[in-house]
Amino acid sequence: MFAPLLKKLFGSKNERDVKRMAKAVQAINALEPQMVALSDEQLKAKTAEFQQRYAKGETLDQLLPEAFAVVREAGKRVMGMRHFDVQLIGGMTLHDGKIAEMRTGEGKTLVGTLPVYLNALSGKGVHVVTVNDYLARRDANWMRPLYEFLGLSVGVVTPFQPPEDKRAAYAADITYGTNNEFGFDYLRDNMAFSLDDKFQRELNFAVVDEVDSILIDEARTPLIISGQAEDSSELYIKINKLIPRLKRQVEEVEGKPSEEGHYSIDEKTRQVELNEQGHQFIEDLLSQNGLLGEGESLYSAHNLSLLTHVYAALRAHTLFHRNVEYIVQGDQILLIDEHTGRTMPGRRLSEGLHQAIEAKEGLPIQAESQTLASTTFQNYFRLYNKLAGMTGTADTEAFEFRQIYGLDVVVIPTHRPIARKDFNDLVYLTQEEKYAAIITDIKQCQALGRPILVGTASIESSEYVSKLLQQAGIEHKVLNAKYHEKEAEIIAQAGAPGSVTIATNMAGRGTDILLGGNWEVEVAALENPTEEQIAQIKAEWQKRHQQVIEAGGLHVIASERHESRRIDNQLRGRAGRQGDPGSSRFYLSLEDNLMRIFASDRVKNFMKALGMQSGEAIEHRMVTNAIEKAQRKVEGRNFDIRKQLLEFDDVANEQRKVIYHMRNTLLSAEDVGETIKEFREETLNATINQHIPPQSLPEQWDVEGLEAALYSDFAVRLPIQQWLDEDDKLYEETLRSKILEQIVAAYYEKEELAGAEALRAFEKQMLLRVLDDLWKDHLSTMDHLRHGIHLRGYAQKNPKQEYKRESFTLFQELLDSIKRDTIRVLSHVQVRREDPAEEEARLRREAEELAKRMQFQHAEAPSMEQAVAGEDEELPEGPAPVVPLEPVRNEQKIGRNEPCPCGSGKKYKHCHGQLD
């Protein structure tokens, strides 16, 4: 009630933040005459002075006004660019560990130099994170002269970089790279066999460019390093042939599903589900083709992997379309980033989905993979001591940034007022009418000499618009995932008078469209251009630039609304940069995906009430509001998916931290002898407790079993029964001590034979190997657990709580297994003298061989809607298409003929007992 009044009196939080920083800007401006008076050498010397002052106890906040003034002056001298006051505010926002929302063309790259320089003074390193390798290299090369003038080193990390180059890049004061490469290097570091093989230092400060794209759009999908698993390509091919025989269950007019069909598709959640008829039909087909035993159920425990293959193939055929979600290049499937329209070479979908698409397209099927290490961007970026980001559009996602990352969004004022006109959406009944209107708009703008940018949501749409323009005889350029090697050339001239550029999702392109075209690209195309040629090109560009401004600037046409308002705003933001004129218009139809799935009924009824005819459009704020409401619905759903992914990964993340800490401790330890000693005693006590329970009577002891277990775990044959027969004074505790003495003595014999130094090195390497192997298996088990955990909802249990409980049990078992397996390997190994350095070199060679076979995936996010179905939503009918882990039983086993605890009334063997 009082919020509007308080806001009027005191301003919004954003206004107060900007006002507070404006005072600091005055202090920086006051230092400018002092900096101008310094010679180049004196200005360079400021860096060493700041570093000394920091070492003596001054904080970075105290150094900020002078440091920013130094960077501003260096920018003028080295690059001919002076930071505006609003850019100083942006720099302070980033230094404070916040997100700066700055409009397109406001110079985000230059803004980044301010906090990057300041934080690099600490000597702990700064990471500048971009969305692709091209931008990482471009920005690093662009800003390198400025940083090097000030005495700071700059490095760039890229995929397939030689290890020594990558190590040098991370050792630099400032390191540029992509979010994927930083994330994968973190995972690779935690698979290293030596401290010398690690790349990254402490994760100190990261500035994330296009922060919304990296921390939100890509947060649904985990980073995975995987190795090859068993080959099942024949199975994919056989099942692929059966899927086209299944029919989709369509909805009738009333919204109820018809009885015809085998499966239904939920387009909102991108899930596909076999119905009862479909289950029976596919089981019959599998039986006829010899893939399923006669009378067997697809849901029997030993057939669950077959079920996974069926659902993977079904999703490949129904949810993934060529030239929309992926393209075929040679004999490979290249995924398309839905947010940027770029292809993602090297990325593969998980859970057999990529192989299913390869089978669908008749391509060679690459072997499935097994997860070796994984994390999410959410958990990786939260490892940094301080995180900041910048983007043109963050305010719509401010709540998520705050809740997930603890980052506030500050909207930075523009240097010049925005002069762009954003027209209301035009909504047509059909796509055909919509595209006809788009062509008409293009012709009108071209006649005026205005450049036009047409934004589409898929390659298919971009190629359709291109076809229509060809038929209309309009010259144009196409920028989509198929042709992005020509990207820079196309973008450079997208602002030329009358030019028409079709772009698939301009988000994340990272290049401004300059009105009149880009004269620097024209100069670069010449061989050894003279001063006269450069001056002539500049003059011609100035004439074109003025011509485009007078015509009304760049006109942005969008062929449909994206799921996210933010992506729409990014497309709009391509026009009207730095106060230039421009305009934008969205053309929609009731047949568009977003309208059809989320907003069609209400808008359709409204349009019918108006008595709209074919070819007519509606332009009304109510329609635009209805569409934005639909977008907010989608954004909310996507936020829930990301939040649920994080909640599940948080459980794994705590375990990941423990394992990685254990691993780093081992790597930095010169001697793990004490650790091995502890493992030996704990393993021995566990083995003895299993056969001689604490405080038990001798009659309860399983001596024969203990003798066998000791040989299995410690490779020693001990006559325990003989000891007990010969010595009446032996009881539980003294027996433990005697067994330990014998085991230690046997191990010391091994040490004398191999040499203490060699055995210590071997212990360390073997412990690392056991830890890695078991962690890899644990990740696979956790995957299966997560994918099947929603089934617990049938038994009225909370899937999230069940996941936490069972994953904790699994982790305890993992820690016990690491101890037991390490001792077992060390006890059984036959030792011979070998140089520790040779052993380490051999292990490193093996690790390099493994690295060659690794795959780096930013895999499709596993769906989490079903995982929380037990909490908020109605459970789906029938089990989901995933492989559940067999539950760890802490409760009493249920008899097969007893009633099922889920409350269905069926016998357990006919209900959930089929999964046991």
Curated annotation (Swiss-Prot):
Protein name: Protein translocase subunit SecA
EC number: 7.4.2.8
Cellular component, GO annotation: cell envelope Sec protein transport complex; cytosol; plasma membrane
SMART domains noted in UniProt: SecA_DEAD (SM00957), SecA_PP_bind (SM00958)
Cofactor detail note: May bind 1 zinc ion per subunit.
Biased composition (Basic residues): 906-916
Subcellular location: Cell inner membrane; Cytoplasm
SUPFAM superfamilies: Helical scaffold and wing domains of SecA (SSF81886), P-loop containing nucleoside triphosphate hydrolases (SSF52540), Pre-protein crosslinking domain of SecA (SSF81767)
Family: Belongs to the SecA family.
Membrane topology category: Peripheral membrane protein
Matching InterPro entries: Helicase_ATP-bd, Helicase_C-like, P-loop_NTPase, SEC_C_motif, SecA, SecA_CS, SecA_DEAD, SecA_motor_DEAD
List of residues binding Zn(2+): 900, 902, 911-912
Function statement: Part of the Sec protein translocase complex. Interacts with the SecYEG preprotein conducting channel. Has a central role in coupling the hydrolysis of ATP to the transfer of proteins into and across the cell membrane, serving both as a receptor for the preprotein-SecB complex and as an ATP-driven molecular motor driving the stepwise translocation of polypeptide chains across the membrane.
Cofactor(s) for this UniProt protein: Zn(2+)
Predominant location: membrane
